[in-house]
Amino acid sequence: MNITLFRATKRPNSSTYQAAKYLISKLSDVGTVYEFTLPEDMPHICLGCYACINGKEDKCGGYAYLEKINRAMDDSELLIFCAPVWCFHAPGQIKSFLDHYGYRWMVHRPNFAMLHKQAVIISTAGGGGLKETPKDIKDSMDYWGMARTYVVTQAVWGGFWNNMSEKFKTSLLHKLDKTAVRIEKHAKHLTPSLKVKALYKMFERLHLQGKMLPVDDSYWKETLKK
């Protein structure tokens, strides 16, 4: 199982990053792990130029950065997002990164390979924001067509991995253990969740009926012919 990991901070004692490393250690047959730190590995902020929406994603100012990330995701069966809560929501660099993939939502031109991949969102917080932060990312995962997305959250009261209370760390590790089991269980016979199936069927019907943007309808029709 190859993995692509996204992190929002370079801090080595980051609770979300260390949690991700622990999760990976609990998975069997792990192959290549691609790591990207945001914003360093994707510094270009979406400008709303509409190039990608219009089918010209190679004209995006951040395309050179996205190419490398896209290759890693294509080669991975699992994506992991380390998303600490910042001001009750996902870090801006993660939101900015996901904005570049609006054209990959099923309403436009999804990468259908996502229907055969899984994702994990790990969020920690000093207090609030543990519902809002993973939702910021899970919305994209569901509309990308990600087969299964798991959310792991833990309040840590501002503690980092090296000074987190044993109570919080024990709770977090237990959740990660359970998530690792779920990932491997579903990987054997991976099927999309009911929500993703429903979204896929709805957009498939709309695109095949030619009711969406022409560039998107053509993409669906041509891709499904293959």
State where each predicted segment sits:
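A short secondary-structure junction signal
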Residues: 92, 130-135, 163-164
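Glycine-rich beta-alpha junction loops
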Residues: 42, 126, 155-158, 201
